[in-house]
């Protein structure tokens, strides 16, 4: 199993927050499930210091901005009188300015992401009737979390999906392994969105200490469901195969029942 992926998915769920609210060229169809481009307003402010962009971030995207400042960057509280200058100064680092430009270029168009995201969540809703869709937006972080989940909202840090060979990812001081970098591509945006969202809804139990096998099985359940939502087998591990065998033997078990079942002995 991709233990690094499992570890990342588990760790990243500690950061919560977020929402969606911006009219852009990628949001041209009413009722279409798309990624909201909060990152564009963020980029405008961080590269030009445009005060109107900052105001739009705060008034149009208050929860995203709070999550970015307090939970992702951890540079202070959003109500701090000095937070505007702290926020702008933080991104004046030449590396982060280059990161912003790379995100703007790589993700100028995300129609492919929107298309796969909508199709995948539609499949997920078919498997899990009544599942509420998250509000999804994109942001630019600082190479920390990939996906931010909380309160029915889901934020994508585009700076973590610039490609396996993106120069910053290759630097030793960032410490990314080859396996980690293999998943830092735009092809993993939608799988990560679904996986993190499901882990937020169906977290590992905290009322007892889990063995490593139990933890791997929990991630295996989520990854198996992600495969079904994607319509392809992206994750093919001993644990996803274990879950697949279990579901074939128990055709009356729903996906929701599978995810809620934390008695891992039933699945092994």
Q: What do the predicted segments below correspond to?
A:
Residues 2-9:
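Sec-dependent signal peptide recognition
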Residues 10-11, 134:
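Exposed boundary/loop context
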Residues 14-17:
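C-terminal motif of bacterial Sec signal peptides marking the signal peptidase cleavage site
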Residues 19-89:
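N-terminal mature-domain "stem" immediately C-terminal to a signal peptide or N-terminal signal-anchor/transmembrane
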Residues 87-268:
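Acidic/His-rich structured neighborhood in mature extracellular/periplasmic domains
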């Amino acid at each position: 199993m991709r233990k690094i992926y499992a570890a990342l998915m588990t760790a990243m769920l500690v950061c919560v927050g977020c929402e969606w609210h911006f009219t852009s060229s990628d949001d041209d169809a009413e009722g279409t499930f798309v990624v909201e481009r909060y990152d564009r307003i963020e980029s405008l402010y961080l590269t030009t210091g445009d005060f109107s962009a900052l105001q739009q971030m705060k008034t149009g995207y208050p929860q995203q901005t709070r999550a970015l400042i307090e939970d992702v960057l951890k540079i202070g509280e959003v109500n701090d009188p000095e937070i505007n200058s702290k926020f702008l100064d933080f991104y004046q680092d030449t590396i982060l300015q280059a990161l912003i430009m790379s995100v703007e270029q790589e993700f100028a168009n995300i129609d492919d992401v929107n298309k796969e995201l909508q199709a995948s969540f539609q499949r997920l809703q078919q498997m899990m009737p009544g599942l509420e869709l998250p509000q999804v937006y994109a942001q630019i972080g600082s190479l920390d979390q990939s996906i931010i989940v909380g309160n029915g909202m889901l934020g994508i840090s585009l700076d973590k999906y610039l490609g396996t060979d993106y120069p910053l990812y290759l630097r030793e001081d960032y410490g990314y392994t080859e396996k980690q970098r293999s998943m830092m591509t735009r092809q993993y945006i939608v799988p990560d969105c679904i996986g993190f969202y499901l882990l937020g809804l169906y977290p590992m139990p905290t009322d007892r200490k889990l063995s490593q096998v139990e933890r791997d099985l929990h991630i295996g359940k989520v990854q198996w469901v992600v495969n079904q939502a994607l319509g392809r087998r992206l994750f093919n591990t001993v644990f996803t195969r274990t879950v697949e065998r279990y579901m074939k033997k128990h055709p009356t078990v729903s996906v929701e029942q599978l995810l809620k079942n934390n008695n891992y002995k039933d699945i092994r």
